[in-house]
Amino acid sequence: MSSDWIFGACAVPDARMRSAALARQEQLTKPPGALGRLEHLAVRLAAWQRTDRPGVQRVWIAVYAADHGVAAEGVSAFPQAVTGEMVRNFARGGAAIAVLARELGARLEVVNLGVVNDPGDLPRVRRAWIAPSSANICEQPAMTATQLRDALAAGADSIAQAKSCDTQLFVGGEMGIGNTTAAAALGCALLSQFPQAMAGAGTGLDAEGIAHKATVITRALALHADASSPLERLRRLGGFEIAALVGAYIAAAQAGIPVLVDGFITTAAALVATRLNPGVREWLLFGHRSQERGHAALLRAMDAEPLLQLDLRLGEASGAAVAIPLLRSACALHNGMATFAEAGVSDA
């Protein structure tokens, strides 16, 4: 199966519903613009969902787990075994995103794409196994062409399931020791940034560890300097879970499902997705600005204004999940407030 589907046309938001939602906002019992960005969020959701009364009750959260060969370079404060252990923790409901998904009433899908410490078959975990780990990007490409194709397809499979459940919002998350290094390398390659500007603390590195991480990224960029296309850069510098996120974001935009992007790693995937298929950008909201050093540069590259800034750097889709009540509030206000005529209140 080819990956040419990633270049297919994206859905187009409904301009008529956008206009209807804007008109309703102008009639609600408040000064124009008094609810700030909440008004714009409601209008965007109305256009995406093709209704003048949008909602964010049916949420699909997919967390993609995969290990990285670059972890062998000592770029994380945690051992590689943690990835597989966290997959088990997701399945048991003990991880942060599992708690948040329960609180939100959201559907949580965990996808095991390949971890060194494989927990095997687990309830509530989809096994889309590619390999125990990507390759070390300091020595060779992270993925073969076949592995990249399979990872992209794994993300698209999530969207097919989400669409069948009439999902109103998709949120992607990730788990993988070493994946901030891969995301930073991708960011450097796509934005012509210096590694020192993109390498951050990740799981908790000190200044010396961050400097070492930047050196590792420099080596990887030098090895893969001839990679010119976004897809080839993803293949050489990314990872299974990052590629799955790229596939999910593209498939969601093609299916007309809005996406709430999480933190640093998911934003790197979103940047790749928009470089591969520019129509994806119209379907993206950004949940928060993380504490990870390179996140601000990625957000600027997509002219993205995140909803929250809480100094988070956990990943797992946790920051995006925390922002979902904000979207629900925007919809509740839009749908539930009275108009001036309904309330018998004088308009300006």
Curated annotation (Swiss-Prot):
EC numbers: 2.4.2.21
Active site positions: 316
Reaction catalysis annotation: 5,6-dimethylbenzimidazole + nicotinate beta-D-ribonucleotide = alpha-ribazole 5'-phosphate + nicotinate + H(+)
Enzyme class, UniProt record, top EC level: transferase
A GO molecular function held by the record: nicotinate-nucleotide-dimethylbenzimidazole phosphoribosyltransferase activity
InterPro entries, A to Z: Nict_dMeBzImd_PRibTrfase (IPR003200), Nict_dMeBzImd_PRibTrfase_bact (IPR017846), Nict_dMeBzImd_PRibTrfase_N (IPR023195), Nict_dMeBzImd_PRibTrfase_sf (IPR036087)
Name of this protein: Nicotinate-nucleotide--dimethylbenzimidazole phosphoribosyltransferase
Name of the coding gene: cobT
